[in-house]
Amino acid sequence: MDKRHDPSRRIIAPHGTQLSCKSWLTEAPMRMLMNNLHPDVAERPEDLVVYGGIGRAARDWDCYDKIIEVLQRLEDDETLLVQSGKPVGVFRTHADAPRVLIANSNLVPHWANWEHFNELDKLGLAMYGQMTAGSWIYIGTQGIVQGTYETFVSVAKQHFEGISKGKWILTGGLGGMGGAQTLAGTMAGFSVLACEVDETRIDFRLRTRYVDKKATSLDEALAMIEAANQAGKPVSVGLLANAADVFAELVKRGVTPDVVTDQTSAHDPLNGYLPQGWTMAEAAAMRKTDEAGVVKAAKASMAVQVQAMLNLQTAGAATLDYGNNIRQMAFEMGVENAFDFPGFVPAYIRPLFCEGIGPFRWVALSGDPEDIYKTDAKVKELIPDNPHLHNWLDMARERIAFQGLPARICWIGLKDRARLALAFNEMVKNGELSAPVVIGRDHLDSGSVASPNRETESMLDGSDAVSDWPLLNALLNTASGATWVSLHHGGGVGMGFSQHSGVVIVCDGTDAAAKRVGRVLWNDPATGVMRHADAGYEIAKNCAKEQGLDLPMQD
Protein backbone atom coordinates (compact mmCIF):
# COMPACT_ATOMS: atom_id res chain seq x y z
CA MET A 1 0.00 0.00 0.00
CA ASP A 2 1.30 3.44 -0.97
CA LYS A 3 1.03 5.65 2.12
CA ARG A 4 1.23 8.72 -0.12
CA HIS A 5 -1.82 7.88 -2.23
CA ASP A 6 -5.37 8.26 -0.93
CA PRO A 7 -8.02 9.21 -3.50
CA SER A 8 -10.63 9.49 -0.75
CA ARG A 9 -9.00 12.62 0.66
CA ARG A 10 -10.49 16.02 -0.17
CA ILE A 11 -8.76 18.74 1.82
CA ILE A 12 -10.36 22.17 2.21
CA ALA A 13 -8.91 24.72 4.64
CA PRO A 14 -11.33 26.17 7.20
CA HIS A 15 -12.71 29.65 6.51
CA GLY A 16 -13.90 32.30 8.92
CA THR A 17 -12.74 33.21 12.41
CA GLN A 18 -13.41 30.03 14.39
CA LEU A 19 -10.08 28.50 15.41
CA SER A 20 -9.14 24.83 15.30
CA CYS A 21 -5.78 25.62 16.90
CA LYS A 22 -4.81 27.55 20.04
CA SER A 23 -4.00 30.81 18.24
CA TRP A 24 -3.75 32.34 14.79
CA LEU A 25 0.01 31.69 14.88
CA THR A 26 -0.69 27.96 14.61
CA GLU A 27 -4.03 28.19 12.81
CA ALA A 28 -2.26 29.94 9.93
CA PRO A 29 0.26 27.19 9.07
CA MET A 30 -2.50 24.60 9.47
CA ARG A 31 -4.79 26.41 7.02
CA MET A 32 -1.98 27.06 4.57
CA LEU A 33 -0.85 23.41 4.61
CA MET A 34 -4.44 22.39 3.94
CA ASN A 35 -4.79 25.05 1.25
CA ASN A 36 -1.77 23.63 -0.57
CA LEU A 37 -3.82 20.44 -1.01
CA HIS A 38 -7.10 22.08 -2.02
CA PRO A 39 -8.38 20.36 -5.19
CA ASP A 40 -8.33 23.68 -7.06
CA VAL A 41 -4.75 24.35 -5.94
CA ALA A 42 -2.74 21.12 -6.00
CA GLU A 43 -1.82 19.20 -9.15
CA ARG A 44 -2.39 15.75 -7.59
CA PRO A 45 -3.81 16.29 -4.11
CA GLU A 46 -4.58 12.60 -3.62
CA ASP A 47 -0.80 11.99 -3.77
CA LEU A 48 0.06 15.09 -1.68
CA VAL A 49 1.66 16.54 -4.85
CA VAL A 50 1.19 20.29 -5.07
CA TYR A 51 3.19 21.20 -8.19
CA GLY A 52 6.49 20.76 -9.98
CA GLY A 53 6.70 17.04 -10.72
CA ILE A 54 6.62 15.51 -7.23
CA GLY A 55 6.68 18.64 -5.05
CA ARG A 56 4.75 17.57 -1.95
CA ALA A 57 3.20 19.26 1.07
CA ALA A 58 3.85 16.33 3.45
CA ARG A 59 5.81 13.09 3.21
CA ASP A 60 2.77 10.81 3.41
CA TRP A 61 -0.78 10.92 4.72
CA ASP A 62 0.23 9.69 8.19
CA CYS A 63 2.69 12.57 8.41
CA TYR A 64 0.07 15.02 7.16
CA ASP A 65 -2.42 13.89 9.81
CA LYS A 66 0.20 14.12 12.54
CA ILE A 67 1.26 17.63 11.47
CA ILE A 68 -2.36 18.79 11.70
CA GLU A 69 -2.74 17.12 15.09
CA VAL A 70 0.42 18.75 16.46
CA LEU A 71 -0.47 22.20 15.13
CA GLN A 72 -3.83 21.97 16.86
CA ARG A 73 -2.17 21.36 20.24
CA LEU A 74 0.93 23.52 19.78
CA GLU A 75 1.41 26.28 22.37
CA ASP A 76 2.57 29.80 21.54
CA ASP A 77 5.96 29.16 23.10
CA GLU A 78 6.61 25.91 21.22
CA THR A 79 8.14 25.17 17.82
CA LEU A 80 7.38 22.19 15.58
CA LEU A 81 10.28 20.81 13.53
CA VAL A 82 9.42 19.24 10.16
CA GLN A 83 12.05 17.13 8.37
CA SER A 84 11.25 16.48 4.72
CA GLY A 85 7.52 16.54 5.32
CA LYS A 86 7.62 14.56 8.58
CA PRO A 87 6.92 16.12 12.01
CA VAL A 88 9.90 15.01 14.10
CA GLY A 89 9.86 17.13 17.25
CA VAL A 90 8.22 19.83 19.34
CA PHE A 91 10.47 22.02 21.48
CA ARG A 92 9.97 24.83 23.96
CA THR A 93 11.19 28.12 22.47
CA HIS A 94 9.52 31.51 23.06
CA ALA A 95 6.63 33.61 21.80
CA ASP A 96 8.64 35.43 19.12
CA ALA A 97 10.25 32.27 17.74
CA PRO A 98 8.80 30.58 14.64
CA ARG A 99 5.99 28.15 15.36
CA VAL A 100 7.27 25.84 12.60
CA LEU A 101 10.76 25.26 11.19
CA ILE A 102 10.97 23.18 8.02
CA ALA A 103 13.87 21.51 6.20
CA ASN A 104 13.06 19.70 2.95
CA SER A 105 15.11 17.58 0.55
CA ASN A 106 18.50 18.68 1.90
CA LEU A 107 21.38 16.32 1.09
CA VAL A 108 25.13 16.42 1.70
CA PRO A 109 26.55 17.81 -1.58
CA HIS A 110 28.34 14.64 -2.74
CA TRP A 111 25.03 12.76 -2.59
CA ALA A 112 22.85 15.63 -3.82
CA ASN A 113 21.55 14.02 -7.01
CA TRP A 114 18.28 12.55 -8.23
CA GLU A 115 19.52 8.97 -8.09
CA HIS A 116 20.29 9.11 -4.36
CA PHE A 117 17.22 11.18 -3.57
CA ASN A 118 14.94 8.76 -5.41
CA GLU A 119 16.32 5.86 -3.36
CA LEU A 120 15.59 7.76 -0.15
CA ASP A 121 12.16 8.70 -1.47
CA LYS A 122 11.32 5.04 -2.13
CA LEU A 123 12.37 4.16 1.42
CA GLY A 124 10.12 6.87 2.84
CA LEU A 125 13.10 8.83 4.17
CA ALA A 126 12.79 12.01 2.13
CA MET A 127 10.32 14.30 0.40
CA TYR A 128 10.81 16.71 -2.47
CA GLY A 129 9.42 20.03 -1.28
CA GLN A 130 9.94 22.05 -4.48
CA MET A 131 9.79 25.65 -3.24
CA THR A 132 6.35 26.57 -1.88
CA ALA A 133 4.86 23.05 -1.87
CA GLY A 134 6.72 21.83 1.20
CA SER A 135 6.79 25.26 2.81
CA TRP A 136 2.99 25.67 2.76
CA ILE A 137 2.66 28.97 0.92
CA TYR A 138 1.63 27.90 -2.60
CA ILE A 139 -1.30 30.00 -3.84
CA GLY A 140 -1.95 28.28 -7.14
CA THR A 141 -0.64 29.46 -10.46
CA GLN A 142 -1.18 33.13 -9.50
CA GLY A 143 1.99 32.78 -7.43
CA ILE A 144 4.19 33.05 -10.50
CA VAL A 145 1.93 35.05 -12.83
CA GLN A 146 3.27 38.50 -12.03
CA GLY A 147 6.91 37.43 -12.20
CA THR A 148 6.21 35.88 -15.59
CA TYR A 149 4.28 38.98 -16.65
CA GLU A 150 7.19 41.22 -15.61
CA THR A 151 9.55 39.02 -17.60
CA PHE A 152 7.42 39.16 -20.75
CA VAL A 153 7.03 42.94 -20.42
CA SER A 154 10.83 43.19 -20.21
CA VAL A 155 11.15 40.94 -23.27
CA ALA A 156 8.88 43.31 -25.21
CA LYS A 157 10.90 46.33 -24.10
CA GLN A 158 14.27 44.78 -24.94
CA HIS A 159 13.41 43.12 -28.23
CA PHE A 160 10.31 44.80 -29.68
CA GLU A 161 10.51 48.44 -28.53
CA GLY A 162 7.79 47.70 -26.00
CA ILE A 163 5.30 46.52 -28.62
CA SER A 164 3.87 43.03 -28.07
CA LYS A 165 0.72 43.39 -30.17
CA GLY A 166 0.65 40.89 -33.01
CA LYS A 167 3.51 38.83 -31.56
CA TRP A 168 3.45 35.37 -30.04
CA ILE A 169 5.27 33.18 -27.56
CA LEU A 170 6.02 29.48 -27.97
CA THR A 171 6.44 27.50 -24.77
CA GLY A 172 5.89 24.13 -23.13
CA GLY A 173 4.25 23.01 -19.89
CA LEU A 174 0.93 23.90 -18.27
CA GLY A 175 1.55 22.58 -14.77
CA GLY A 176 1.45 24.59 -11.57
CA MET A 177 4.27 26.87 -12.67
CA GLY A 178 4.04 26.64 -16.46
CA GLY A 179 0.33 27.36 -16.33
CA ALA A 180 1.14 30.98 -15.52
CA GLN A 181 2.74 31.58 -18.90
CA THR A 182 -0.46 31.71 -20.92
CA LEU A 183 -2.22 34.27 -18.74
CA ALA A 184 0.93 36.32 -18.10
CA GLY A 185 1.67 36.38 -21.81
CA THR A 186 -1.75 37.65 -22.84
CA MET A 187 -1.68 40.19 -19.99
CA ALA A 188 1.58 41.47 -21.49
CA GLY A 189 -0.06 41.65 -24.93
CA PHE A 190 1.39 38.50 -26.54
CA SER A 191 -0.45 35.50 -27.90
CA VAL A 192 0.83 32.25 -26.41
CA LEU A 193 1.05 28.70 -27.76
CA ALA A 194 1.75 26.29 -24.89
CA CYS A 195 2.40 22.59 -25.50
CA GLU A 196 1.17 20.16 -22.84
CA VAL A 197 1.05 16.34 -22.88
CA ASP A 198 -1.55 16.00 -20.11
CA GLU A 199 -5.01 16.98 -21.35
CA THR A 200 -6.34 17.26 -17.79
CA ARG A 201 -3.88 20.10 -17.18
CA ILE A 202 -5.09 21.99 -20.23
CA ASP A 203 -8.68 21.52 -19.07
CA PHE A 204 -7.76 22.71 -15.57
CA ARG A 205 -6.18 25.88 -16.98
CA LEU A 206 -9.27 26.45 -19.15
CA ARG A 207 -11.50 26.10 -16.10
CA THR A 208 -9.43 28.55 -14.04
CA ARG A 209 -9.17 31.01 -16.98
CA TYR A 210 -5.43 30.73 -17.45
CA VAL A 211 -5.88 29.35 -21.00
CA ASP A 212 -8.34 30.68 -23.57
CA LYS A 213 -8.53 27.81 -26.08
CA LYS A 214 -7.52 24.17 -26.55
CA ALA A 215 -6.10 22.67 -29.74
CA THR A 216 -5.32 19.08 -30.64
CA SER A 217 -3.13 19.72 -33.68
CA LEU A 218 -0.33 22.15 -34.46
CA ASP A 219 -2.12 23.43 -37.55
CA GLU A 220 -5.22 24.21 -35.49
CA ALA A 221 -3.15 25.99 -32.83
CA LEU A 222 -1.22 28.08 -35.36
CA ALA A 223 -4.47 29.09 -37.05
CA MET A 224 -5.84 30.29 -33.70
CA ILE A 225 -2.69 32.31 -33.07
CA GLU A 226 -2.72 33.81 -36.57
CA ALA A 227 -6.39 34.79 -36.34
CA ALA A 228 -5.88 36.44 -32.96
CA ASN A 229 -2.83 38.37 -34.10
CA GLN A 230 -4.60 39.62 -37.21
CA ALA A 231 -7.50 40.76 -35.03
CA GLY A 232 -5.09 42.50 -32.67
CA LYS A 233 -6.42 40.61 -29.65
CA PRO A 234 -4.01 38.20 -27.92
CA VAL A 235 -5.08 34.63 -27.27
CA SER A 236 -3.60 31.74 -25.32
CA VAL A 237 -3.79 28.23 -26.74
CA GLY A 238 -3.11 24.98 -24.93
CA LEU A 239 -1.92 22.46 -27.52
CA LEU A 240 -2.15 18.78 -26.61
CA ALA A 241 1.27 17.71 -27.85
CA ASN A 242 4.83 16.97 -26.79
CA ALA A 243 6.91 20.16 -26.69
CA ALA A 244 9.97 18.48 -28.22
CA ASP A 245 7.87 17.35 -31.20
CA VAL A 246 6.29 20.76 -31.72
CA PHE A 247 9.47 22.82 -31.33
CA ALA A 248 11.32 20.60 -33.82
CA GLU A 249 8.40 20.67 -36.26
CA LEU A 250 8.33 24.47 -36.27
CA VAL A 251 12.03 24.50 -37.16
CA LYS A 252 11.32 22.06 -39.98
CA ARG A 253 8.47 24.22 -41.28
CA GLY A 254 10.48 27.43 -41.02
CA VAL A 255 7.92 28.97 -38.68
CA THR A 256 9.63 31.29 -36.18
CA PRO A 257 7.79 32.54 -33.09
CA ASP A 258 8.66 35.95 -31.72
CA VAL A 259 9.58 34.54 -28.30
CA VAL A 260 10.58 31.00 -27.28
CA THR A 261 10.83 29.58 -23.77
CA ASP A 262 9.80 26.48 -21.79
CA GLN A 263 8.36 25.52 -18.42
CA THR A 264 7.99 21.77 -18.64
CA SER A 265 9.13 19.90 -15.51
CA ALA A 266 12.52 19.28 -17.10
CA HIS A 267 14.16 19.63 -13.68
CA ASP A 268 12.97 16.06 -12.90
CA PRO A 269 13.62 13.78 -15.89
CA LEU A 270 12.17 10.75 -14.12
CA ASN A 271 8.82 12.17 -13.01
CA GLY A 272 8.40 15.45 -14.83
CA TYR A 273 9.10 15.17 -18.56
CA LEU A 274 7.42 12.80 -21.02
CA PRO A 275 9.79 11.38 -23.67
CA GLN A 276 8.85 11.77 -27.32
CA GLY A 277 6.64 9.00 -28.62
CA TRP A 278 5.59 7.81 -25.16
CA THR A 279 2.11 7.90 -23.67
CA MET A 280 1.65 8.94 -20.06
CA ALA A 281 0.54 5.41 -19.18
CA GLU A 282 3.69 3.95 -20.74
CA ALA A 283 5.87 6.36 -18.80
CA ALA A 284 4.10 5.54 -15.52
CA ALA A 285 4.65 1.82 -16.09
CA MET A 286 8.29 2.26 -17.10
CA ARG A 287 9.05 4.30 -13.98
CA LYS A 288 8.32 1.17 -11.95
CA THR A 289 10.59 -1.12 -13.97
CA ASP A 290 13.31 0.96 -15.64
CA GLU A 291 13.98 4.32 -14.03
CA ALA A 292 17.31 4.75 -15.81
CA GLY A 293 15.67 4.12 -19.17
CA VAL A 294 12.99 6.74 -18.49
CA VAL A 295 15.59 9.32 -17.48
CA LYS A 296 17.71 8.64 -20.56
CA ALA A 297 14.73 8.89 -22.91
CA ALA A 298 13.44 12.07 -21.26
CA LYS A 299 16.83 13.78 -21.43
CA ALA A 300 17.22 12.74 -25.08
CA SER A 301 13.91 14.46 -25.85
CA MET A 302 15.02 17.53 -23.91
CA ALA A 303 18.11 17.64 -26.11
CA VAL A 304 15.86 17.67 -29.19
CA GLN A 305 13.78 20.48 -27.72
CA VAL A 306 16.78 22.61 -26.71
CA GLN A 307 18.40 22.14 -30.12
CA ALA A 308 15.16 23.38 -31.66
CA MET A 309 15.19 26.37 -29.29
CA LEU A 310 18.74 27.17 -30.41
CA ASN A 311 17.68 26.91 -34.06
CA LEU A 312 14.71 29.20 -33.45
CA GLN A 313 17.02 31.65 -31.70
CA THR A 314 19.27 31.66 -34.77
CA ALA A 315 16.19 32.30 -36.90
CA GLY A 316 15.43 35.43 -34.89
CA ALA A 317 13.29 34.39 -31.92
CA ALA A 318 13.99 35.99 -28.54
CA THR A 319 14.82 32.79 -26.67
CA LEU A 320 15.13 32.36 -22.91
CA ASP A 321 15.38 29.61 -20.31
CA TYR A 322 12.62 29.99 -17.72
CA GLY A 323 14.40 28.23 -14.89
CA ASN A 324 13.57 24.53 -15.26
CA ASN A 325 17.17 23.42 -15.96
CA ILE A 326 16.39 22.14 -19.44
CA ARG A 327 19.65 23.60 -20.78
CA GLN A 328 21.66 21.57 -18.26
CA MET A 329 19.83 18.36 -19.19
CA ALA A 330 20.47 18.95 -22.89
CA PHE A 331 24.11 19.82 -22.23
CA GLU A 332 24.54 16.49 -20.44
CA MET A 333 23.17 14.79 -23.57
CA GLY A 334 25.73 16.41 -25.84
CA VAL A 335 24.18 19.74 -26.84
CA GLU A 336 27.41 21.64 -26.19
CA ASN A 337 25.99 25.11 -26.85
CA ALA A 338 22.84 24.59 -24.77
CA PHE A 339 23.64 27.67 -22.68
CA ASP A 340 23.82 29.97 -25.72
CA PHE A 341 20.42 31.37 -24.81
CA PRO A 342 20.17 33.12 -21.44
CA GLY A 343 18.21 32.42 -18.31
CA PHE A 344 15.39 34.83 -17.54
CA VAL A 345 16.90 36.19 -14.32
CA PRO A 346 20.19 37.61 -15.65
CA ALA A 347 18.49 38.69 -18.88
CA TYR A 348 15.43 40.42 -17.45
CA ILE A 349 14.92 40.26 -13.66
CA ARG A 350 18.23 40.90 -11.86
CA PRO A 351 17.94 44.72 -11.72
CA LEU A 352 14.75 44.22 -9.68
CA PHE A 353 16.53 41.84 -7.31
CA CYS A 354 19.24 44.45 -6.73
CA GLU A 355 16.61 46.67 -5.10
CA GLY A 356 15.05 43.85 -3.11
CA ILE A 357 12.06 43.77 -5.45
CA GLY A 358 10.44 40.36 -5.58
CA PRO A 359 7.29 38.26 -5.12
CA PHE A 360 5.41 39.60 -2.10
CA ARG A 361 2.26 37.50 -1.59
CA TRP A 362 -0.52 37.45 0.98
CA VAL A 363 -3.49 35.21 1.74
CA ALA A 364 -6.83 35.97 3.43
CA LEU A 365 -7.24 33.32 6.12
CA SER A 366 -10.92 34.30 6.32
CA GLY A 367 -11.57 32.84 2.89
CA ASP A 368 -13.39 36.08 2.01
CA PRO A 369 -12.34 37.66 -1.33
CA GLU A 370 -13.37 41.07 0.01
CA ASP A 371 -10.37 40.98 2.34
CA ILE A 372 -8.09 40.74 -0.69
CA TYR A 373 -9.91 43.54 -2.52
CA LYS A 374 -9.51 45.78 0.55
CA THR A 375 -5.79 45.05 0.70
CA ASP A 376 -5.50 45.73 -3.05
CA ALA A 377 -6.93 49.18 -2.35
CA LYS A 378 -4.49 49.68 0.53
CA VAL A 379 -1.55 48.87 -1.75
CA LYS A 380 -2.72 51.53 -4.22
CA GLU A 381 -3.21 54.03 -1.39
CA LEU A 382 0.27 53.52 0.06
CA ILE A 383 2.06 53.30 -3.31
CA PRO A 384 0.15 55.95 -5.29
CA ASP A 385 2.76 56.79 -7.93
CA ASN A 386 3.28 53.37 -9.50
CA PRO A 387 0.86 53.00 -12.45
CA HIS A 388 2.52 49.74 -13.51
CA LEU A 389 1.70 48.20 -10.12
CA HIS A 390 -1.83 49.61 -10.17
CA ASN A 391 -2.36 48.18 -13.65
CA TRP A 392 -1.19 44.78 -12.41
CA LEU A 393 -3.61 44.84 -9.47
CA ASP A 394 -6.49 45.82 -11.76
CA MET A 395 -5.68 43.05 -14.23
CA ALA A 396 -5.25 40.54 -11.41
CA ARG A 397 -8.68 41.32 -10.00
CA GLU A 398 -10.30 41.12 -13.42
CA ARG A 399 -8.53 38.08 -14.84
CA ILE A 400 -7.11 35.88 -12.08
CA ALA A 401 -9.44 33.36 -10.47
CA PHE A 402 -8.68 32.63 -6.84
CA GLN A 403 -7.62 29.04 -6.15
CA GLY A 404 -8.40 27.91 -2.61
CA LEU A 405 -8.04 30.70 -0.05
CA PRO A 406 -8.12 34.13 -1.74
CA ALA A 407 -4.63 35.49 -2.31
CA ARG A 408 -2.72 38.19 -4.11
CA ILE A 409 0.83 38.66 -5.29
CA CYS A 410 2.68 41.76 -6.38
CA TRP A 411 6.35 42.47 -6.89
CA ILE A 412 7.51 45.19 -4.50
CA GLY A 413 10.83 46.06 -2.93
CA LEU A 414 12.68 46.66 0.29
CA LYS A 415 11.15 50.00 1.16
CA ASP A 416 7.54 48.86 0.67
CA ARG A 417 7.21 45.30 1.99
CA ALA A 418 7.31 46.13 5.71
CA ARG A 419 5.18 49.25 5.18
CA LEU A 420 2.41 47.28 3.48
CA ALA A 421 2.57 44.44 5.98
CA LEU A 422 2.24 46.82 8.92
CA ALA A 423 -0.75 48.42 7.22
CA PHE A 424 -2.36 45.00 6.73
CA ASN A 425 -1.78 44.20 10.41
CA GLU A 426 -3.47 47.47 11.35
CA MET A 427 -6.43 46.58 9.10
CA VAL A 428 -6.84 43.33 11.02
CA LYS A 429 -6.56 45.20 14.32
CA ASN A 430 -9.25 47.76 13.47
CA GLY A 431 -11.63 45.25 11.92
CA GLU A 432 -11.31 46.33 8.29
CA LEU A 433 -10.31 42.77 7.49
CA SER A 434 -12.49 39.97 8.79
CA ALA A 435 -9.57 37.74 9.87
CA PRO A 436 -5.76 37.71 9.89
CA VAL A 437 -3.69 37.46 6.74
CA VAL A 438 -0.44 35.61 6.13
CA ILE A 439 2.37 37.17 4.14
CA GLY A 440 5.00 35.10 2.38
CA ARG A 441 6.87 34.82 -0.89
CA ASP A 442 8.28 32.40 -3.39
CA HIS A 443 11.77 31.08 -2.66
CA LEU A 444 12.62 32.71 -6.00
CA ASP A 445 13.57 36.03 -4.48
CA SER A 446 16.42 38.45 -4.20
CA GLY A 447 18.34 37.02 -1.23
CA SER A 448 16.85 33.62 -0.57
CA VAL A 449 18.27 31.33 -3.23
CA ALA A 450 21.47 29.98 -4.71
CA SER A 451 20.79 28.46 -8.12
CA PRO A 452 23.58 28.80 -10.71
CA ASN A 453 21.32 27.87 -13.63
CA ARG A 454 18.52 30.21 -12.58
CA GLU A 455 18.37 32.97 -9.94
CA THR A 456 22.14 33.30 -9.44
CA GLU A 457 23.22 32.57 -13.01
CA SER A 458 26.11 34.76 -14.23
CA MET A 459 26.59 36.73 -11.02
CA LEU A 460 28.92 39.67 -11.50
CA ASP A 461 31.60 38.30 -9.15
CA GLY A 462 31.28 34.63 -10.14
CA SER A 463 29.58 33.64 -6.87
CA ASP A 464 26.76 31.76 -8.63
CA ALA A 465 27.10 28.55 -6.56
CA VAL A 466 27.74 30.09 -3.13
CA SER A 467 24.83 28.92 -0.97
CA ASP A 468 25.73 30.72 2.27
CA TRP A 469 23.23 33.41 1.30
CA PRO A 470 19.96 31.43 1.57
CA LEU A 471 21.24 29.88 4.80
CA LEU A 472 21.86 33.34 6.25
CA ASN A 473 18.45 34.45 5.01
CA ALA A 474 16.73 31.57 6.82
CA LEU A 475 18.71 32.15 10.01
CA LEU A 476 17.94 35.88 10.02
CA ASN A 477 14.23 35.34 9.39
CA THR A 478 14.15 32.85 12.26
CA ALA A 479 15.90 35.32 14.56
CA SER A 480 13.57 38.11 13.41
CA GLY A 481 10.41 36.27 14.45
CA ALA A 482 8.83 34.82 11.31
CA THR A 483 5.89 32.48 11.92
CA TRP A 484 7.42 29.70 9.86
CA VAL A 485 10.72 29.38 8.03
CA SER A 486 11.87 26.74 5.56
CA LEU A 487 15.15 25.67 4.02
CA HIS A 488 15.00 23.52 0.88
CA HIS A 489 17.22 21.92 -1.74
CA GLY A 490 16.54 21.28 -5.42
CA GLY A 491 13.52 23.46 -6.05
CA GLY A 492 12.91 24.66 -9.59
CA VAL A 493 15.99 23.12 -11.17
CA GLY A 494 16.26 19.76 -9.43
CA MET A 495 18.57 17.90 -7.08
CA GLY A 496 22.09 19.26 -6.81
CA PHE A 497 21.36 22.56 -8.51
CA SER A 498 19.82 24.86 -5.88
CA GLN A 499 19.39 25.72 -2.21
CA HIS A 500 16.74 28.17 -1.07
CA SER A 501 14.74 29.43 1.88
CA GLY A 502 11.17 30.53 2.51
CA VAL A 503 9.44 32.72 5.06
CA VAL A 504 5.83 33.31 6.14
CA ILE A 505 4.52 35.66 8.83
CA VAL A 506 1.05 36.17 10.29
CA CYS A 507 -0.58 39.58 10.63
CA ASP A 508 -3.06 38.93 13.45
CA GLY A 509 -3.62 42.55 14.44
CA THR A 510 -1.64 42.42 17.67
CA ASP A 511 1.11 44.80 18.70
CA ALA A 512 3.46 41.83 19.02
CA ALA A 513 2.74 40.88 15.41
CA ALA A 514 3.50 44.43 14.30
CA LYS A 515 6.95 44.22 15.86
CA ARG A 516 7.67 40.85 14.24
CA VAL A 517 6.31 41.96 10.87
CA GLY A 518 8.40 45.12 10.92
CA ARG A 519 11.58 43.14 11.55
CA VAL A 520 10.96 40.22 9.20
CA LEU A 521 9.69 42.16 6.20
CA TRP A 522 12.52 44.63 6.37
CA ASN A 523 15.29 42.12 7.00
CA ASP A 524 14.15 39.52 4.46
CA PRO A 525 14.37 41.70 1.31
CA ALA A 526 17.36 43.55 2.79
CA THR A 527 19.37 40.31 2.58
CA GLY A 528 18.78 40.39 -1.18
CA VAL A 529 20.13 43.90 -1.48
CA MET A 530 23.08 42.82 0.69
CA ARG A 531 23.77 39.76 -1.45
CA HIS A 532 23.77 41.73 -4.70
CA ALA A 533 25.78 44.61 -3.26
CA ASP A 534 28.37 42.09 -2.08
CA ALA A 535 28.52 40.73 -5.64
CA GLY A 536 29.35 44.20 -6.93
CA TYR A 537 26.08 45.44 -8.44
CA GLU A 538 25.99 49.25 -8.34
CA ILE A 539 22.17 49.33 -8.23
CA ALA A 540 22.28 47.25 -5.05
CA LYS A 541 25.08 49.33 -3.52
CA ASN A 542 23.11 52.51 -4.14
CA CYS A 543 19.92 50.96 -2.74
CA ALA A 544 21.78 49.87 0.39
CA LYS A 545 23.06 53.41 0.93
CA GLU A 546 19.68 55.00 0.29
CA GLN A 547 17.95 52.64 2.73
CA GLY A 548 20.65 52.90 5.38
CA LEU A 549 21.68 49.24 5.42
CA ASP A 550 24.67 48.47 7.63
CA LEU A 551 26.94 46.49 5.29
CA PRO A 552 30.44 46.65 6.85
CA MET A 553 32.44 45.78 3.73
CA GLN A 554 30.58 48.36 1.63
CA ASP A 555 31.88 51.33 3.64
Swiss-Prot record:
EC number(s) on file: 4.2.1.49
A Pfam family recorded for this sequence: Urocanase_N
Localization terms from the record: Cytoplasm
Needed cofactors: NAD(+)
GO cellular component, one term: cytoplasm
Cysteine-cysteine disulfides: none
Major location (coarse): cytoplasm
Top-rank EC class of the record's enzyme: lyase
GO BP, sorted A to Z: L-histidine catabolic process to glutamate and formamide; L-histidine catabolic process to glutamate and formate
Record InterPro entries: Urocanase, Urocanase-like, Urocanase_C, Urocanase_central_sf, Urocanase_CS, Urocanase_N, Urocanase_Rossmann-like, Urocanase_sf
Keywords, ordered alphabetically: Cytoplasm, Histidine metabolism, Lyase, NAD
Cofactor detail note: Binds 1 NAD(+) per subunit.
UniProt record similarity statement: Belongs to the urocanase family.
NCBIfam families given in the database record: hutU, PRK05414.1
HAMAP family named in the record: HutU
UniProt name for this protein: Urocanate hydratase
Origin species: Shewanella sp. (strain W3-18-1)
